[in-house]
């Protein structure tokens, strides 16, 4: 099938100004916004995700925000399914979808497709792997992965718990390494779309300033109180995907400690800042490798980006 349906992908590292640009474009009335963010999907996780306020979402509605609780799991495959359905619905209205966010795995899965024959998640197998980790430690689980799938073992770290679980899960269900299956299996790519990729890549020094400002605001408006409320409401633990989100992981570790001294709090804030910078670095690297992409230095040429997108799709 020929590519006929335009889709705008508005990408960028955390704190790069993606949402502001997307909202400015939305005001023209010919677009709908689809969030591409693995943290914004969670209800009640607002401050640490820099989620648009209820008032902002009323003015600039986003699909795929607040769709599950922090106890639930949401995969890249589910994102592709949900996003493609929304893209088709938006086109049926005569509008153009703008996918805006910084979760590069979601963008990669949409652009390149997913392996179609990998087994679905199995709750019993996953529970058995997590029980093994609880009893023997994650190093033991990682060592098992390295034995059955050396390629995955070389790629993953012991801290990559969800990726380790998925790789071992696939092996136990199929008897084959996940890396072998991924290399052999056909991809399901939505060829009916024409993707127009735009990446906001600000100067790194300026981006680091924006990240520091965002985190300072996060702490000052009650982020720790938010995480405390989440713990009480949902009985959260650090094995949940929601609690591996940058900021939440560090805050959860701090709040579960017996010693919440000033020094430990400062250490927690430093760890969150470092993790956020590392996330931005990974996002930056992936975006630079993406072909057929228009790049903008956010703080110097955002008007150029707005004008270019308006002229093309407004």
Curated annotation (Swiss-Prot):
Its cofactor is Mg(2+). Keywords: ATP-binding, Magnesium, Nucleotide-binding, Transferase, tRNA processing. ATP binds at residues 12-19. Gene3D superfamilies: 1.10.20.140, P-loop containing nucleotide triphosphate hydrolases. Substrate binds at residues 14-19. It catalyses: adenosine(37) in tRNA + dimethylallyl diphosphate = N(6)-dimethylallyladenosine(37) in tRNA + diphosphate. It is an enzyme of class 2 (transferase). Its EC number is 2.5.1.75. GO terms for biological process: tRNA modification. Disulfide bonds: none annotated. Transmembrane segments: none annotated. It comes from the Bacteria. GO terms for molecular function: ATP binding; tRNA dimethylallyltransferase activity. Residues 37-40, 162-166 are annotated as: Interaction with substrate tRNA. InterPro entries: Dimethylallyltransferase, IPT, P-loop_NTPase. The record marks 103, 126 as: Interaction with substrate tRNA. NCBIfam families: miaA. PANTHER family: TRNA DIMETHYLALLYLTRANSFERASE. Belongs to the IPP transferase family. Catalyzes the transfer of a dimethylallyl group onto the adenine at position 37 in tRNAs that read codons beginning with uridine, leading to the formation of N6-(dimethylallyl)adenosine (i(6)A). Monomer. This is tRNA dimethylallyltransferase.
